Amino acid sequence: MLENDIRLAVKAALDEDLGHQDPNSSLSLSQRFDADITAMLIPAEKIAQASLITREEGVFCGKAWAEQVFNQLGGEVALHWHVDDGDLVVPNQLLCELEGPARAILTGERTAMNFIQTLSGVASLTKRYVDKLSGTHTRLLDTRKTIPGLRTAQKYAVTCGGGQNHRIGLFDAFLIKENHIMACGSIDKAVKAARKLHADKPVEVEVESIDELTQALDAQSDIVMLDNFDVTMMLEAVELNNRYKAKGLGVKLEVSGDVTIDTISNFAKTGVDYISVGALTKHVRALDLSLRLK
């Protein structure tokens, strides 16, 4: 899925930049380059070298996307990497050296950098949250609050920062929320319906009270999301779940809502298994990069 998504995302980004958004178009490579009217100022035969550096500290991510950009622009630009996805980087560190036709480098630079700076931003923020969980068994999860068209890319970036993926989409796990419960009639009925429909898929139930948690435990769901619980309620939920575990039951507990870089550590200390944070992919601040021809 990821490999295919990289190819499609890069094509869409290049088409957006070069003004060819007709999915049925079959423009030649030379015609695509002609669309970059500024690059046309440079002789087609000119070969150039360039260096990509980071201006700030963070976690690098996006290598495959950058490579795909220049592959789709003819494959004549050689990329010599000095980092891998997941590597910590510092200000002014050399990330990559490029060599090839000057037109191709300049046509692809912004698209390649857009992917790298965005995904590195996700990975860097993820690491900040993960660091706050040090000393606990709690694991950080992402959400579906992603940039449209970049779901798998952002979720990959989360793993590069040390986080884990929640469900990828609506197809790989059940997440039974308030409206689903209301439509099904109860938590128990919703869980049973899920088991009957797809016995192989994980079933998670979102609850808003200890009473609803009890219902989800009795229904034997796999995971329970504690939505907007305060710390006192989280502690009570963990204690209740431990009592169920002592009887051979119990679930994994996930915390969601009101999670910030300042609150996540205290939430983790309650003993929950997971904390999901939409900000990882929703509040994206790009890593500052710079590319210069030599």
Regions found by a protein language model. Give the residues of each.
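Short secondary-structure boundary segments
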Residues: 228, 257, 279
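Active-site loop ensemble at the mouth of alpha/beta enzyme cores that anchors a bound cofactor
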Residues: 290-294
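Alpha-helix termini
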Residues: 242-248
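Acidic/glycine-rich phosphate/pyrophosphate-binding loops and surrounding catalytic core
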Residues: 1-219, 223, 235-240, 252-254, ...
